[in-house]
């Protein structure tokens, strides 16, 4: 028994880090908005996109365990132009993604400590904290923090969900008219929801980097099935929590006539009130602290993931010695942390106080570039780059092809809808 627990501790971490990046904005914000605006019908789309995206996230962990190199190294094997394209995709999206997550985290920070007067200084303080923690600390610190944070979120969400289901949905206001999903605005929101459900596919490279770092830190090389089991449990957790958040949004907001605010601090207050309304007013401060902790964990994971990915990509593209072990590698990691913080701050300031617009822009951007990364990952785990015994099963390959067709189809549909057929929606 003790040996089994010890093994679980040794392999747990990368999947939970993935869950942390997913739970922050896509669940706490987007899933709640989806339920509040469109009700339980949105759950079908949440489940569908989570299933179709699953293979491409799993392939990051699979490739790392099988080859003992990151999937970014795999992109280099596909050809230098492929790796360069990955770098371009990362640079084009990272400031919007990090800015969106940071903006939400700042809202919960302001709400918790009643610091709305700080304005942009709240996000500056958060970004500085992230850079300091990650540049001074090591993976072990991030790993342990995330385990605590995910536990807090799961417990509080399951409790709130259970109490909400017991109490039942609110009574719709008189003359309530449900929002139509199949309108231009509704479709754009659906694409935004699916873009980060459970998170952006280009973040799959982080799984492989975290898997390798966990092996290095724990000095334990798990079997492939152990690595995949840890990831699958974490992925399933993100799916279940997404359904819970949609349900919470539906039961508490749908039909109430209330609109979730666009200001990040006010939005945070609405989310926390959603919890406390079913758990009791006494829980407000507890939930506020838990929600901020979750968002802080998400922004830490995002900063770490992007900086690791950029670090490894630049090493492979521009350095002859790609050992990834040197002091210069650590310095480069810190440089990317600073660049990421600076660029993301500028992005947030450009969007002003428009929380929904920033999040929707970042999530739709992720959805449009998703098919490219999906194809890269599929080629790596089904071709000559991976041993036959470590390649995915036939059903997973079929699911992958279905996912690529789905993502590609919707990406093309978005481009046609946005730039050719209509000008009704703008950021």
PLM region descriptions:
Residues 134-164, 181, 362-370, 396, ...:
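Membrane-interface loop-to-helix entry segments
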Residues 1-27, 192, 218-229, 233:
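Membrane-interface "cap" regions at the ends of multi-pass membrane proteins
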Residues 2-4, 39, 66-93, 112-119, ...:
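Transmembrane-helix boundary/entry motifs in multi-pass membrane transporters
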Residues 151-180, 190-209, 373-386, 410-423:
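Hydrophobic alpha-helical segments and their helix-loop junctions in multi-pass secondary transporters
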Residues 54-64, 211, 236-269:
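Extracellular/periplasmic helix-exit of transmembrane alpha-helices
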Residues 15, 87, 112-136, 151-162, ...:
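Transmembrane alpha-helical segments of multi-pass small-molecule transport proteins
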Residues 18, 45-76, 85-96:
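Juxtamembrane transmembrane-helix boundary signature
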Residues 66, 82-114, 295-315, 354-355, ...:
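Hydrophobic transmembrane alpha-helices that form the core helical bundles
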